[in-house]
Each structure stands twice: as C-alpha cells, then as structure tokens.
Amino acid sequence: MTCSLMMLGTGNAAVTRCYNTCFAVRNGAQYFLTDGGGGNGILARMQQSGIPLAGIHEIFLTHTHTDHIFGVVWVVRMIAQSMNAGKYAGVLRVYGHAEGVQVLESICRATLPGKVTAHFGLDILFTPLEDGAAFEAAGMQGLAFDIGSTKARQFGYALVLPDGQRLVCLGDEPYNERNESIARGADWLLCEAFCLLADAERFKPYEKHHSTAHDAGRLAAGLGVKNLLLYHTEDATLETRRAAYAAEAASHFSGTVLVPDDGEIVDLC
C-alpha cells in the first residue's frame, strides 16, 4: 500500500531503549512528518525506514517539549543542506501553533550555520496555524486543533487520507472533550498511553498529565473510532508492551488496537 503510517519512535520523553514518539504519514512518494524526537536519532530512524529527505515537504510540530522539537532542528538542517547540494526541489513548510514555530525558528537560528538559515523565509517556511486552521500536507488535507494542554500549548490534527478515511492525532496528553467533534468516529485515533493502569503507581502517569492504555481504550470506545494506535509509552516493559497494552485497551474497546514498535509500518489505505 502507498498510504501508511511509519512509526519512527514510540517512547515518552525519558526513554533510552526506544526513540521518542514521532512518525510520518506516507502518501505515495510524499512523507508528512510529525515531530522529530529529541535529537539527531531522527536521521537514523528515517534512514532505516527509507524516508528520503527529498520526500518531506511538510512537518508538523505539536509542541515545544525537548522530546519533540530538537529532532526537527536536525531535519531542517539536513534538508537545507540538501537544497544547497541541489538534491531537494521545492519548499519545506513547518506547521505548528505560533509560539511553537517561533521557538523552533529561534533555536534553528541560534544553532545552525548561515548557509542553512539563509533559506528561512524563502524555501524553508515556519508556518503558524490557528486553532481550527486548515493545511495541506503530502497531498492530503488537514485540520489543526488546540488539544487544550495545561502544560505547554500543544496542537493535534485531523488528516483526511487519500481514500477518505480520517486520521486524528491527539498529541501526547489526555484527550480534551473540547475536541469531541473532531475525534468522534475517526478511522484512526493516535493516542498516548504512558503505561498500563496496573503500573500507574510505578510510572505515575496522572501526576505527569498523561494517561494509560486503560484510559485510551475507554476513550476509543466512547468516541466510536475504528482503530486505536497507542504511543508515547514508557520503555521499561518493551518486551511485553505490545501484548499487555493491547489487552488492557481491548478490555474496553472492541475495535482494532495497535501498539507499534519503533520502525513499524502500519498500512492505512
């Protein structure tokens, strides 16, 4: 299939045994990247997944936490270098809320060489979106929305896939009812699950404003979605994560539950 979800990382901020959560939606030869994890590990993940820099023309930054933003700096750098080498055609647009893209551009200007930043405002565009704004990525139509974070401002999005299915990314914090009209009935719901409910005392998700696989399953059932994909997890239980998380979510949700590993590709359409 030419429409797929490529999970580059599946872990939370502090993981060391997998990479921070970030992914690309592939539409043919086009790749829409969401976040970049916490460093240049994104480059190896992209290489291993066969994602060419020349195929990325849109990036979505959900928020400015370190495990999401710093990998994007590296992708911006490498794409600019590809432009300079004549190996990248067209424009790169980095979407996000106004504060997010401003912080990202500031970091890039402070840390990247002039031959990279010379592209800013020309063929590398930091593009702020408002809550409810439409955007285009990899030939697909998207809708950005404020997830209602109580920590750093964060945006998620709904994306219409080539076959008309809807994919909704809720970011990495618990669902807010303000976005029910967007999330309800989604074909694919991407949702954070910091740990199992059974391990809540150990990992303390609620104190960190995160949720569990149990919570995600109840949410998916309540919203009537078809497929639930869990990410942004702890990495102490990687060996049993897929089966255990899926089972806990499935105790409430009768649809399909996916708990991918880093590098896994999920066929969407």
Give residue ranges: language-model regions.
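Conserved beta-strand hairpin/beta-sheet module of binuclear metal-dependent hydrolase folds
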Residues: 1-49, 153-171, 188
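Divalent metal-coordination and catalytic microenvironments
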Residues: 5, 35, 46, 63, ...
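Active-site-proximal loop/helix segment associated with metal-binding centers of metalloenzymes
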Residues: 15-17, 128-198
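Active-site neighborhood of phospho(di)ester-bond hydrolases with catalytic His/Asp-centered motifs
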Residues: 33-37, 57-64, 97, 167-173, ...
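Active-site metal-binding motif and surrounding structural segment of the metallo-beta-lactamase
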Residues: 40-92
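Short histidine/acidic/glycine/proline-rich micro-motifs that form metal-
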Residues: 66, 94, 100-101, 233-238
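Metallo-beta-lactamase
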Residues: 88-153, 250, 258, 262
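Cap/insert and terminal regions of metallo-dependent hydrolase folds
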Residues: 174-263
